[in-house]
């Protein structure tokens, strides 16, 4: 199920994004400051280029690029 980013509390959204951008393998040696990486994800969410997916089975949220989201969830 897709979760509209603007329906999350601000602190919850920030923590979700920070968790995503600080995971192993997501920085690829990028020395960009955390605040900048968080801002980029926020902008992608606002533009519809990224989405928050809640997996009912695992009870976890994931941030996905638009092309990674199952098509049936975007319709």
Swiss-Prot record:
**Stored Pfam families:** UPF0270
Annotated SUPFAM superfamilies: YehU-like
What HAMAP family does the record point to?
UPF0270 (MF_00690)
Q: Which InterPro entries match?
A: UPF0270, YehU-like_sf
The entry assigns this protein to a family as follows: Belongs to the UPF0270 family.
- Name of protein: UPF0270 protein PSEEN1465
